[in-house]
Amino acid sequence: MKALQEKILREGSVSGNDILKVDSFLNHQIDVAFLNEIGREFKERFKGEKVDKIFTIEASGIAIASIVSQYFDNAPVVFAKKSESKNLDKDVYETNVYSFTKAREYSVKVSKKYINKGENILIVDDFLANGRAALGLKDLIEQAEANLVGVGIVIEKGFQAGGALLKANDVRLESLAVVESIDNGTVKFR
């Protein structure tokens, strides 16, 4: 998505050779008008697919999933929770995922009420780095005996293993921007 690449170059910043910060428009402050363009693009990429629910992981994926939902007939948005919560049902699907950004492993959970057998689920998230979050969500979908339509990623770090890992697991991956490298403050796209 050319407009996304241009926005990253214009408004993003880098830290080291592996961190791309897009907090000015995607995951801290949100440019809702631009997020609508992202939602439209995901609809185009997954055109013709039946999507019953949009699935993500807290927290940065929630805003993206909510906008994307509007382009899939307002499909409900479900997000896996990383933290313990007194108001989360005890009857949950659960798996462990490693977060590249936080450099730690999380137990993520989703209530069995919200992912159901036979449903067609589209995963969306802001970043793909090592692919563990997406594979964790895929595991939750499989536990529920639901169907994974695919994974929609706003920004894939192509220099990390996530994309290859998802493809090796027969996951349809649609990344709107793939960063080939971050070198000396310069972002290069695939």
From Swiss-Prot:
Gene3D superfamilies noted in UniProt: 3.40.50.2020
Instruction: Specify the species.
Output: Clostridioides difficile (strain 630) (Peptoclostridium difficile)
Q: What is its EC number?
A: 2.4.2.22
Per the record, its GO cellular-component terms are: cytoplasm
Question: What is this protein's record name?
Answer: Xanthine phosphoribosyltransferase
Which residues make up the binding site for 5-phospho-alpha-D-ribose 1-diphosphate? Answer: A129, N130, G131, R132, A133
The encoding gene: xpt
Assembly description: Homodimer.
Top-level lineage group: Bacteria
Briefly state the protein's biological role: Converts the preformed base xanthine, a product of nucleic acid breakdown, to xanthosine 5'-monophosphate (XMP), so it can be reused for RNA or DNA synthesis.
Pfam families attached to this UniProt entry: Pribosyltran
* Alphabetically ordered keywords of this record: Cytoplasm, Glycosyltransferase, Purine salvage, Transferase
Give the family, as the similarity comment puts it.
Belongs to the purine/pyrimidine phosphoribosyltransferase family. Xpt subfamily.
Main location, first listed in the record: cytoplasm
Tell me which Gene Ontology terms the entry assigns under biological process.
purine ribonucleoside salvage; xanthine metabolic process; XMP salvage
